[in-house]
A protein has these predicted regions:
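Flavin (primarily FAD) cofactor-binding/catalytic cores of flavoenzymes
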Residues: 1-243
Length: 243
């Protein structure tokens, strides 16, 4: 099996296929990973608390105006798993356990597929994602609120993965390709000049410049949590207060 994409869906499917005894080749994209639990608390507990801090005007989830590049709105959510009560997913461990990692799928010619260079860079990005972007928010919340939590017990895992430039799918015995590269949105049915160059509606926390037209659940509508369950309710409450 060739699985293309390492957001949450691709990583979870690759893990399940491996556990079922399948030989899996996983095409790695530019996506982070996060521990399922940090300092004794589930990641979604942290997300919910940080979303509440944001709603109260304190330092919580990063807001859309803090993104260094608007293209960051399209970055996939960091991967982890909820299976069996939830656990971490580490691509380097996948490789050590038999999953064959390759770079981002770059093209195909018949049964031969090509992969872009930069596999190690993508793995390093995934490894650093939590410590660079999310852990500081958790630690700031602990310091501000005096939470009494156990120490960080994560252990580093080092494993070198060789770079692969191309594969012959027939020779490798690949019988199926799973595309888990995400999906896009299309607001083409709204014929109004309120969208930016990337197709996102221009709003102030969901409220557009057109009277009566608001949006909910869009990526980074207000902050990192706007497109998932930990943040959409807070955005919905804000919109309801505007009417």
């Amino acid at each position: 099996m060739l699985v293309v994409g390492t957001g949450q869906t691709g990583v979870q499917l690759a893990e399940e296929l491996r556990d079922a005894g399948r030989e899996v080749i996983l095409s790695v994209g530019h996506c982070g990973r996060a521990p399922r639990r940090y300092r004794g608390r589930d990641t979604f507990w942290w997300l919910r608390r940080l979303a509440e801090e944001s709603a109260a005007g304190r330092r919580g989830l990063p807001s859309v105006d803090q993104l260094p590049d608007p293209r960051g709105r399209l970055t996939g959510n960091p991967h982890m798993s909820g299976h069996g009560g939830g656990h971490d997913t580490n691509l380097r461990k996948f490789s050590a356990d038999g999953v064959r990692l390759v770079g981002r799928l770059d093209g195909a010619d018949g049964e031969r597929v090509r992969f872009a260079p930069g596999l190690e860079a993508n793995l390093e990005f995934a490894d650093a994602f939590f410590d660079d972007r999310f852990r500081p928010l958790c630690e700031a919340l602990i310091e501000r609120t005096g939470l009494d939590l156990p120490p960080d017990d994560r252990e580093p895992f080092a494993h070198t993965v060789p770079e692969v430039s191309e594969l012959d799918l027939a020779a490798e015995g690949v019988s199926a390709v799973l595309w888990t590269s995400g999906y896009g949105f299309d607001f083409g049915w709204i014929d109004l000049p309120i969208f930016d160059e990337m197709g996102f509606p221009r709003t102030t926390r969901g409220v557009s410049a057109v009277p009566g037209l608001s949006f909910i659940g869009t990526l980074w509508q207000f902050n990192l949590g706007s497109a998932n369950l930990v943040g959409v309710a807070l955005d919905a409450r804000h919109l309801a207060e505007q009417w």
